[in-house]
UniProtKB/Swiss-Prot annotation:
InterPro entries: Ade_MeTrfase_dom_2, DNA_methylase_N6_adenine_CS, M_m6A_EcoRV, MeTrfase_D12, SAM-dependent_MTases_sf. Belongs to the N(4)/N(6)-methyltransferase family. It comes from the Bacteria. This is Type II methyltransferase M.EcoRV.
Length: 298
């Protein structure tokens, strides 16, 4: 029986929903430190691991602002339901044009509820900003986007994640991955989900070879457990950095299908890699009968 994965209210391309069971299975059973994510994104991994203590960080201030609003009860499921019903009606009556009014309003005032509205009604769930920091993703062209069932689904997601946050000690910070990893202690577990190098990404900041090498060097010198995710290969090419940089660590893979962007080239099956410094004897105890993950390199 597969574990139920709780989906957060914020969507993004490349969300790690399908990797959550694999990640949960390799988290050390005796883990009692802080769960640290330098690239929290939607937060789907942290909210499903549901640790008692968590430090969740990102360079996208709008993600951090949204989850701090949930933590502080400034955003609740009921508030989201009322807001999306009201704004959804305006969207429908305008045949979708109201989306661009909300986008302009968000770019001026940065309200978390507007960010949620845009995130759930933009094209393909993309999170993309221009050089001036303005959200610039177009409308999904579905004026009836916020039907009652969809609003209920989102408000339930807000309530579920709010409950998880309220049961633990969660800190959300907007800062660089270097600063976040610098806060890690020996008993902590670090999960990194950086933008995938060499792939189409929609993050607040770009990611290149220098960033990948800096992350590798930072994690290599870390005196704590880490797990990081990246892409391994697809039908077109392989991620050379897995071989050239990360091959000294244990690497596990899982294949699944990603919907990324409008390009057919980016809609092929992709093999994900989980890279970790967790000891080999612990990895060897992972149940392999489901075929979810496979140790491919040591």
């Amino acid at each position: 029986m597969k574990d139920k994965v709780f989906v957060p209210p914020i969507k993004s391309q490349g969300i790690k929903t399908k990797l959550v069971p694999c990640i949960k299975r390799i988290v050390p059973k005796n883990f009692n430190g802080v769960w640290v994510e330098p690239f929290m994104g939607t937060g789907v991994v942290a909210f499903n691991v549901a640790p008692k203590d968590a430090l969740l960080c990102d360079t996208n201030p709008h993600l951090i602002s949204f989850y701090n609003a949930l933590k502080n009860k400034d955003i609740t499921g009921d508030l989201v339901k009322d807001f999306l019903y009201r704004e959804g009606e305006k969207l429908l009556l305008s045949n979708g044009e109201y989306y661009y009014e909300v986008r302009e309003r968000f770019n001026n005032y940065k309200e978390p509820l507007d960010f949620l509205f845009l995130n759930r009604s933009c094209f393909n769930g993309m999170i993309r900003f221009n050089s001036k920091g303005g959200f610039n993703v177009p409308f999904c062209k579905k004026p009836n986007r916020f039907a009652q069932a969809y609003i209920t689904k989102i408000s339930n997601q807000v309530d579920r994640i709010s409950e998880i946050i309220s049961k633990g000690n969660y800190t959300f910070l907007c800062q660089s991955f270097e600063k976040t990893i610098g806060m890690v202690n020996r008993d902590d577990v670090v999960y990194c989900d950086p933008p995938y190098i060499g792939r189409h990404v929609d993050y607040f900041n770009s990611w290149g070879e220098r960033d990948e090498r800096l992350l590798f060097e930072t994690l290599s010198s870390l005196n704590a457990t880490f797990i990081t995710s990246t892409w391994h290969h697809n039908d077109y090419r392989e991620n050379k950095y897995v071989r050239d940089l990360w091959s000294s660590f244990r690497i596990l893979t899982k294949e699944h299908f990603y919907h990324v962007g409008a390009s057919e080239k980016n809609r092929s099956p992709m093999v994900e890699a989980l890279i970790t410094n967790i000891a080999k004897d612990i990895i060897d105890h992972i149940e392999k009968s489901s075929g979810d993950i496979l140790v491919i390199e040591e």
